[in-house]
């Protein structure tokens, strides 16, 4: 037997089990129907009805209903009883998908439920690989930035020619909804790796581009570069999505993943983002927080959509703390507080969340999972710092667990209905593991939550509206405190 034959036999022996494992994994992958039915089977209904509060939506809550209308309505009712809502998935050019979307919208409307749409595919792609969207070198040669994976990212200032096609993709489903008498109440995008983005190698590519240099006189200043790109990105979203949707449905809630009011800093990185060399940052232990341009108002969106995920790198940023949960909680609360503190109360704040450790690199060493208790406490604090509703991204197999944790907290929040829409008044994020306190104020009453990451059994105090509020330790519970019983500060 020759050497080549031996090698071939060995390779075949290795490939067979790998192929079999891959097939078995595919067979185990849950379908949308299995996901929805499992949620109904495993997640208990709310004990406090929504009655107008925002439902939970997410990446796995869309796209499927049974064929019969009556059974489909039963599914929609069962999900609503659990605080969950489906969105129709839009796929421009796919008539079958459009028919399914219209049917879902009709049934939701007949039941008095909000009609939701996930329209990300209508927003793709500005950078479609055509040379008309490329950067231009000094000699006129087109070139692309390949630091964002498979998408060919080009020149931010050569995208006007793409606007009409993107607008047409939105009109291709908006007009049929309108013609069918179905009102879209909620529309969201997850529009990420497309259009102008300043991270990865974008800055260096733009410095080489004659068009970029002409549009950004101070291109060597990263903040000037960032401002110019985010202005174009906001314009694309406003003109091609928001304004077009509002022509048909002026009262729709419209938002995009990761676009929200903030204080000028972003405390997290998406899975594809890297800080360019020489770009400014704020250090916090090993974390590098980034300056971020204000894009929510220029984009025109009508709900804020921050992202509070357990990104894999987050835990490793804070080695000074032995408390694993606080290494997660601290960063996630910074993100949620940043949005809650700066989003006007009249603007719905709908927060993306995810509990399972998010986007670990292949072959990366494991990190401690955030505990269920700490995650649910985080959700409580998000609500008490201004979040009005939740969305979730997760894998199919994670869905039931993720939703269960969220629904349990939502039910608890609904048990304090009189505080829904109340004013958040406490935004401190402790820089050491200790007592975290958040509160909503309704007239002279406070709904308070205290969560401890230390051994302090005694009360803590906070000042609200000029009064000293004493908060005893009460693990896992909220407290309602009458401000009029609290002494004035300064005495």
What is the predicted role of each segment?
Residues 6-17:
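Bacterial N-terminal signal peptides
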Residues 17-18, 210:
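Short, low-complexity, intrinsically disordered N-terminal segments
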Residues 21-25:
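Boundary at the C-terminal end of the N-terminal hydrophobic targeting segment
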Residues 26-491:
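Glycan-processing catalytic domains of CAZymes
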């Amino acid at each position: 037997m020759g050497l080549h034959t031996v090698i071939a036999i060995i390779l075949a022996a290795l490939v067979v089990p790998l192929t079999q494992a891959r097939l078995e994994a595919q067979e185990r992958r849950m379908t949308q129907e299995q996901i929805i039915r499992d949620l109904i089977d495993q997640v208990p209904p709310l004990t406090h009805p929504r009655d107008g509060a925002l439902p939970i939506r997410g990446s796995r809550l869309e796209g499927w209903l049974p064929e019969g209308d009556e059974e489909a309505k039963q599914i929609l009712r069962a999900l609503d009883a659990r605080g969950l809502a489906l969105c129709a998935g839009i796929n421009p050019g796919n008539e079958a998908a459009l028919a399914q979307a219209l049917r879902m919208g009709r049934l939701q409307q007949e039941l008095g439920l909000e009609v939701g749409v996930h329209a990300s595919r209508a927003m793709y792609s500005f950078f479609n690989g055509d040379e008309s969207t490329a950067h231009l070198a000094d000699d006129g040669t087109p070139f692309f930035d390949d630091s964002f994976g498979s998408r060919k990212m080009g020149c931010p200032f050569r995208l006007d020619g793409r606007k009409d096609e993107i607008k047409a993709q939105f009109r291709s489903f908006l007009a049929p909804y309108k013609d069918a008498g179905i009102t879209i109440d909620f529309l969201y995008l997850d529009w990420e790796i497309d259009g102008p983005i300043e991270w990865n190698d974008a800055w260096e590519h733009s410095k080489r581009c004659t068009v970029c240099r002409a549009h950004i006189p101070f291109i060597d200043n990263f903040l000037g570069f960032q401002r110019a790109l985010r202005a174009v990105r906001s314009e694309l979203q406003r003109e091609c999505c928001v304004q077009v949707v509002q022509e048909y449905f002026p009262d729709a809630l419209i938002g995009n993943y990761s676009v929200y009011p903030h204080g000028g800093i972003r405390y997290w990185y998406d899975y594809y983002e890297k800080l360019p060399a020489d770009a400014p940052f704020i250090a916090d232990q090993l974390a590098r927080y980034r300056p971020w341009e204000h894009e929510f108002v220029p984009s025109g969106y009508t709900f804020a959509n921050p992202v509070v995920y357990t990104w894999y790198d987050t835990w490793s940023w804070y080695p000074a703390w032995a408390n694993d949960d606080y290494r997660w909680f601290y960063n996630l609360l910074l993100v949620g507080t940043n949005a809650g503190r700066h989003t006007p109360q009249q603007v719905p704040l709908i927060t993306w969340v995810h509990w399972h450790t998010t986007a670990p690199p292949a072959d990366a060493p494991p990190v401690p999972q955030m505990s269920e208790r700490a995650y649910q406490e985080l959700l409580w604090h998000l609500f008490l710092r201004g979040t009005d509703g939740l969305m979730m991204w997760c894998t199919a197999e994670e869905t039931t667990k993720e939703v269960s944790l969220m629904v349990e907290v939502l039910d608890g929040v609904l048990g304090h209905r009189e505080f829904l829409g109340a004013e958040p008044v406490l935004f401190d994020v402790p820089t050491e593991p200790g007592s975290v306190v958040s509160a909503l104020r309704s007239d002279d009453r406070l709904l308070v939550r205290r969560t401890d990451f230390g051994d302090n059994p005694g009360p803590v105090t906070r000042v609200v509206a000029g009064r000293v509020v004493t908060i005893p330790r009460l693990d896992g519970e909220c407290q309602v405190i009458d401000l009029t019983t609290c002494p004035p500060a300064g005495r």
